[in-house]
């Protein structure tokens, strides 16, 4: 009488590394979501609180720069805030994937879909703000847009710095989406 592979335990030895890899991917996913949430929160707060008033004024005009003077920066702050909120809410599902490895394929597919949507939102916000920051640093002579970062140094430094956190979150989203796709393929 032959002994089957299930009775000898050979199948469980083959599937054990796969489960360990999926758990490792889930833990990495959780950590990356926290880092991306911190990056988007920092970008939104840094841009949302940026304002500078020049020390000289005229009788009727006060020279100031505030982030909401440009709709692009408003969109940047809004997109970073939405993505940060999503990342905080998705931490619960990511933690669920760490605890319960089985029957999580459907929720992983949902997360990949929502991650892709948030990736697009974050990328468009960061790219639009990056364009305005570039024009404010270097100007565009053909369109008669002159650089104003020579006058508003503090404003431009904070806006430029906030782009770093947002673009780091974009890269992290790419990694999260790829890791989720690998994890789904292993199920």
UniProtKB/Swiss-Prot annotation:
PANTHER family: CASP-LIKE PROTEIN, CASP-LIKE PROTEIN 1U1. Coiled coil: none annotated. The chain crosses the membrane at residues 25-45, 73-93, 109-129, 164-184. InterPro entries: CASP/CASPL, CASP_dom, CASPL. Homodimer and heterodimers. The keyword Transmembrane helix applies. This is CASP-like protein 2. Belongs to the Casparian strip membrane proteins (CASP) family. It comes from the Eukaryota. One of its GO terms (cellular component) is plasma membrane. Keywords: Cell membrane, Membrane, Transmembrane, Transmembrane helix. It comes from Lotus japonicus. Residues 1-24, 94-108, 185-187 are cytoplasmic. It is a multi-pass membrane protein. Residues 46-72, 130-163 are extracellular. Its main location: membrane. It is found in: Cell membrane.
């Amino acid at each position: 009488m032959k002994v089957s592979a299930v009775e000898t335990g050979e199948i469980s030895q083959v599937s054990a590394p796969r489960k360990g890899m999926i758990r490792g991917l889930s833990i990495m996913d959780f950590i990356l979501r926290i880092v991306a949430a911190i990056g988007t929160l920092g970008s939104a707060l840094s841009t949302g609180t940026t304002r500078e008033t020049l020390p000289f004024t005229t009788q009727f005009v006060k020279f100031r720069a505030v982030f909401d003077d440009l709709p692009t920066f408003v969109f940047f702050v809004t997109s970073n805030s939405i993505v940060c909120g999503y990342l905080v809410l998705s931490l619960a599902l990511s933690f669920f994937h760490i605890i319960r490895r089985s029957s999580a394929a459907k929720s992983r597919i949902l997360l990949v879909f929502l991650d892709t949507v948030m990736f697009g939102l974050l990328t468009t916000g960061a790219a639009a703000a990056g364009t305005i920051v570039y024009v404010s640093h270097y100007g565009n002579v053909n369109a008669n847009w002159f650089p104003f970062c020579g006058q508003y140094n503090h404003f431009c430094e904070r806006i430029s710095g906030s782009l770093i956190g947002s673009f780091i979150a974009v890269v992290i989203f790419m990694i999260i989406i790829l890791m989720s796709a690998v994890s789904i393929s292993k199920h």
